[in-house]
Regions:
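A short C-terminal boundary segment appended to hydrolase-like catalytic domains
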Residues: 283-344
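Active-site-proximal segments of metal-dependent phosphoesterases and phosphodiesterases across multiple
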Residues: 174-238, 242, 247
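Conserved beta-sheet core of the metallophosphoesterase superfamily
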Residues: 216-293
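Extended active-site neighborhood of metal-dependent phosphoesterases/phosphodiesterases
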Residues: 63-188
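Active-site-proximal beta-strand elements of phosphoester/diester hydrolases
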Residues: 1-13, 166-178, 208-212, 258-263
Length: 344
């Protein structure tokens, strides 16, 4: 299976600027090198720039993003429409709708751990700043034909690949407390977000988590716990936010997990190399190999090229995976003939 990982588009108007149209066209062309029927498209947040403040249309700004970006991709790759999974980023919250009471409640949550489970149920009824986003999510997945469970704080999906594997995808809203620009150390993932998600996709062969923020951005009381849970329960984790590429394959006592921090697809231009726009293709064979294709956008050539700063000359690196996703095989213990003599 192949996973196309996009992140951080930051749509800043009702239409795309010329350079952004060129980038999108180049992306669509580049995807063709890797595309196959079982591809999954993951977008790890920041559809909009600063809550869409420069989008003055009466239409939902996320619908405008879909029309300008996603629909162009679907024109070339229509099967991706039912295999697209995304989360909100910190730029996708409407901060104009956040009031003083919301900000005071956030301070209380960060101070008092025991209040966090209680607030989960309240946020499932009303999530400040996410009215437009949650409406978009509901509409986008209305005709989704496979298993789904969509809520304001986490959404979960189960799809099947052509080779019979069940893939569980968890979309975790890590941006629900992004009431200002000071995210670092001031955001949470609630226990129920994780517990409910793990339960829904528990019997899947491959488990994927998508969230906007890397682990380092969470509150100090949460970071280690979140890291351990993701490593134990998921095979692949996709994040965004930093606009910097970072790929980690972790094999610890907790489990085996690949973390992909996506580049900005369309962030602010910068002379800093790490901020060159790009995206990633993950070629994943469960229990065998994981191949990562790192792609950078060249403004000079108007096309995507290999990012060979992190991979080989072709922007590729590959790792072998020893994890066994067959639960029955995991329970099998083989004893060598040489050792059996000690058991007589």
């Amino acid at each position: 299976m192949k996973i196309i990982h996009l992140s951080d588009f930051h749509l800043d108007g009702e239409t795309l600027y010329l350079e952004h149209k060129r980038l999108l066209n180049a992306l669509i062309t580049d995807i063709d090198k890797y595309y196959e029927e079982d591809c999954i498209l993951v977008f790890s947040g920041d559809f909009l720039n600063v809550g869409g403040k420069n989008i003055h249309s009466q239409n939902n700004p996320f619908v405008i993003f879909k029309e300008n970006v996603l629909d162009c991709i679907y024109t070339s790759y229509p099967l991706l429409k039912d295999r697209t999974f995304f989360v909100a980023g910190n730029h996708d919250i409407n901060r104009d709708s956040i009031n003083t009471s919301d900000k005071l409640a956030k301070k209380q949550l960060l101070k008092e751990y025991e209040q966090r489970d209680n607030i989960y149920d309240d946020f499932q009824k009303y999530l400040p700043g996410f009215k437009e986003y949650n409406t978009f999510v509901s509409d986008f997945y209305r005709d989704f034909k496979e298993e789904k469970n969509i809520t304001f704080l986490e959404s979960n999906f189960i799809i099947k690949t052509k080779d019979g594997n069940k893939i569980g995808i968890t979309s975790l809203n890590s941006s629900f407390l992004c009431y200002d620009s000071d995210d670092l150390g001031n955001i949470l993932l609630l226990d129920k977000q994780l517990r409910n998600s793990i339960e829904f996709i528990d019997e899947c062969d491959v488990k994927i988590a998508v969230l906007h923020h890397p682990i380092d951005f969470f509150h100090e009381t949460e970071k280690e716990k979140i890291q351990k849970i993701l490593e134990k329960e998921y095979d692949l984790v996709f994040v965004g936010h930093t606009h910097k590429v970072k790929q980690e394959f972790k094999q610890t006592l907790n489990g085996i997990c690949f973390f992909s921090n996506g580049k900005s697809l369309n962030g602010e231009e910068s002379e800093i190399t790490d901020y060159i726009n790009g995206y990633t293709i993950i070629d994943y064979i469960p229990n065998q190999t994981l191949k990562v294709h790192l792609r950078n956008y060249s403004n000079i050539c108007n096309k995507f090229v290999p990012n060979n700063e992190y991979g080989n000359d072709e922007g590729i690196y590959e790792v072998s995976i020893n994890k066994n996703i067959d639960n029955e095989k995991e329970k099998t213990l083989e004893i060598s003939d040489d050792f059996k003599i000690f058991l007589k």
